[in-house]
Amino acid sequence: MQFVAVLAALGALVAPAAAYPHAPMNETLVDVQLTAVGNTMVKATITNKGDSVLNMLQFNTIMDENPTRKVMVFQDGVEVPFTGMMPRYLMSDLTEEFFTTLPPQASVEHTFDIAATHDLSAGGKYVISASGAVPTAEEHSTTITSTALYESNELHMEVDGVQAAAVEQAMNFTPEMQSIHARALEKRTKIVSGSCNQNTLRATMNALGNSARLAQAASRAASQNPRKFQEYFRTNDANAKQRVIARLNSVARESSSANAGVTTYYCSDTMGGCKPRVLAYTLPSRNLVVNCPIYYNLPPLTKQCHAQDQATTTLHEFTHNPAVASPHCQDYAYGYQQCISLPAAKAVQNADNYALFANGMLSNLFVFTLN
């Protein structure tokens, strides 16, 4: 792929895009109720309120088994920082093990410890709530066909800080990791070379370069193509557009160097976050990005529209880092149809919208130039 030449042409791309239909979305299909079942233990009861079977994908929802951001935790009106992981999952060839099947009016319960992903050692009164989008497939299928939004009740909890402090953090650093990370920060190192072999270092550096060029091109396209911006971010509001452009420019700057920046990048995992289907993940509390083994199975840069590759995965993860752009992006939805179904306020704060927009600009250009 002649990437530089293609991106040079991208700056002139202003052709309007055809309208894309929304994926079906239902705001009343899934009900989520939170209850306290211990000092910092929360039980989520998820109920299918519809009249047909729901096959619900667990990734980055309140049903996710990984230490992802399932709830928002507030104390005195201020959100308690999240200390868990923000992963990007491999979304192709999904299998049944990653879905939860619920008949009509049936419920499933999922229990998790909020102290494992939040520092609650201060103790006292906290308010917990959950909101998100569940990708759904039809019964006996793993093809995502719709999305169900959910908003939970507000749960008020009185937390014993001493007990909360005794809960092990899900993404806790080992002494070795603490030392490596401290040295990297002291040297302002972007890629931690000790986490890489020759092949993974080359791939990661290549991904950084491609991420920088993609983000730059997407920033230009955001200002030049209002139809495309509306398609991916659900608005053409001037303030929202400026936020998106600023975030893409920040990602481009952060991606432009392998040995300086505000994030620390690991070619391999030593914290146990590379669970099944995780391509890469970010710890926003530490501005740290980790590539997983299957990241290196992705193509460096794909021509396939809305497919995943190394470059857009790196771009996706950088949007999760508050040092790159604040507020950092969340994982409200995955995949093109789900992302363009988000309301505008969430679309401009959703990491995959940025990755898809960057990929879509490049992919659409190939179609445009080859036709």
Swiss-Prot record:
Gene Ontology CC annotations of this record: extracellular region
Organism: Arthroderma gypseum (strain ATCC MYA-4604 / CBS 118893)
Chain residues that bind Zn(2+): H316, H320, D331
Active-site annotation: E317
Pfam families: Peptidase_M35
Official protein name in the record: Neutral protease 2 homolog MGYG_03465
Cofactors, names only: Zn(2+)
Residues in coiled coil: none
Reaction(s) the record says it catalyses: Preferential cleavage of bonds with hydrophobic residues in P1'. Also 3-Asn-|-Gln-4 and 8-Gly-|-Ser-9 bonds in insulin B chain
Family as reported in the entry's similarity comment: Belongs to the peptidase M35 family.
